[in-house]
Amino acid sequence: MSRFSSLLALVMVAVLAGCGRPEFSDAEKQTIASLALSRLPPLKPDTTNRFADVPAAAALGSTLFFDTGMSGGGTVSCSTCHKIDRQFQDDLPQAVGVGRTNRRTMPLAGVAHDPWFFWDGRRDSLWAQALTPLENPLEQAGNRAAFTHYIKARFGERYERIFGPLPDLSGVPANASPLGTDAERAAWNAMPGAQAEEVNRVFANIGKAIAAFERSIAPPQTRFDRFALDLAAGAEPKGDAAFSSEEILGLKLFIGKANCVTCHNGPRFTDVSFHNTVVPPV
């Protein structure tokens, strides 16, 4: 064999050796383990909602979540945008309810672990978040007086078993809200204060029931989680848990030089904080 051929053979051996399956350092393994869903802590008690972990409240909340009657026109429900087979989002660039909004639908899987809600964090409790789309004219386009009447007519017994007696609604307008149309606001402003407070209480309880249901929506295990569990156990990942060399290199970048893990960390791949990424709004 010529000297050139020998040198070429050595180069090829070195190249092939470099193309082997990448390995993780102990530090990388620790970081990967911290991202596994198995590290997700138990839900903290919701001190703003004493019905948060009441099964009957969650069951009523589930019914309301999927009920198109919980909208002004009877055509849209929470599940219109939060689809059960898409981690409770809809894959659209902008949510479409009664109209088209200017924001993407947020996934609800694991949402109860968040300290604040909406893309801009404008709600600090899950039940307050659940109420907002109900009266948004582009989402469900309803109003709290109409929802209160609807609850009494359709779910009165279930509601009262959980939250206690419903108020007398005989003098409550069919449509009224402090956030609605001009006519709805006028009707709301004409209501006695005590009557408005009773409607607000029922409306708040609607949100608390929906929030109780949403607390039950856990993020599903993914093939990454299975990979991380096998890696932590020292086992060779099998089946869909087996990552390709390209996926492993991508993961090494994610937790290493690319610094993705700086913000996308923890079992839900988020630090639940706000960051200015200098990306213009859609």
Predicted segment positions?
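Periplasmic c-type cytochrome electron-transfer domains
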Residues: 2-5, 18-282
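Bacterial N-terminal signal peptides
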Residues: 6-15
